Amino acid sequence: MSEAFDCAKCSESLYGRKYIQTDDGPYCVPCYDNTFANTCAECQQLIGHDSRELFYEDRHFHEGCFRCCRCQRSLADEPFTCQDSELLCNDCYCSAFSSQCSACGETVMPGSRKLEYGGQTWHEHCFLCSGCEQPLGSRSFVPDKGAHYCVPCYENKFAPRCARCSKTLTQGGVTYRDQPWHRECLVCTGCQTPLAGQQFTSREDDPYCVTCFGELFAPKCSSCKRPITGLGGGKYVSFEDRHWHHSCFSCARCSTSLVGQGFVPDGDQVLCQGCSQAGP
């Protein structure tokens, strides 16, 4: 009598039948599949011992069931992406979820480096400065009417230029004769003292501090001999070819102010009418 050779699960004889040997003993094919086979995540059927099995994360699939959920293309030998538990071929994923580069018009592939600004997307290598055409990457940039400029190019193209040195003004500055100047460039033509923040005047478009202008161009007071600049609302009196500060225009004898009063010239001096009538 022959030795028993039965299935470890159903105990039916395996003589003359196909079986599969395991560490637990031999199994007939139906019992093996029912005991050890995984269930396909797509069709919910067992993946038999004679089927090619594919798995992704903790899910198992028949080879024929491992497909793009949109176009049904087999993903067995294709790159794919999982989106919200759905398997998608790269073409379908790009069509549904990827954006188009605003520069070259090509698809920005999943996982590639990109930049987004103002609702638009660029490949990293396509996001260029409109001036120097170098990639902007993570550098600061300035948008202008649909163009994008790195800071140096924007300043070179649009920033105002100093009337003296012709270099761009990136911050601050002063205005003189409706033109922009660097604060350090607006200096007195005479002594080179910075004029920003202080009172100054000009001659033939050249700026001068009050001191230099007075020394170089202003008439001198016939009394105190100091320059009469007329700046800051300062008033003065002129008579013939002589000039006086208001505060200096007084009688040479009694020192009475002659502003708005009659006076009598007496050589290099001026006298009030009283002193003139009194005689020498």
From Swiss-Prot:
GO molecular function: actin binding; transcription coregulator activity; zinc ion binding
GO BP term (any one): actin cytoskeleton organization
UniProt KW keywords: Acetylation, Activator, Cytoplasm, LIM domain, Metal-binding, Nucleus, Repeat, Transcription, Transcription regulation, Zinc, Zinc-finger
One Gene Ontology CC term in the entry: stress fiber
UniProt domain LIM zinc-binding: residue ranges: 40-92, 101-153, 162-212, 221-275
PANTHER family: FOUR AND A HALF LIM DOMAINS PROTEIN, FOUR AND A HALF LIM DOMAINS PROTEIN 3
Name of the featured protein: Four and a half LIM domains protein 3
Upper lineage: Eukaryota, Metazoa, Chordata, Craniata, Vertebrata
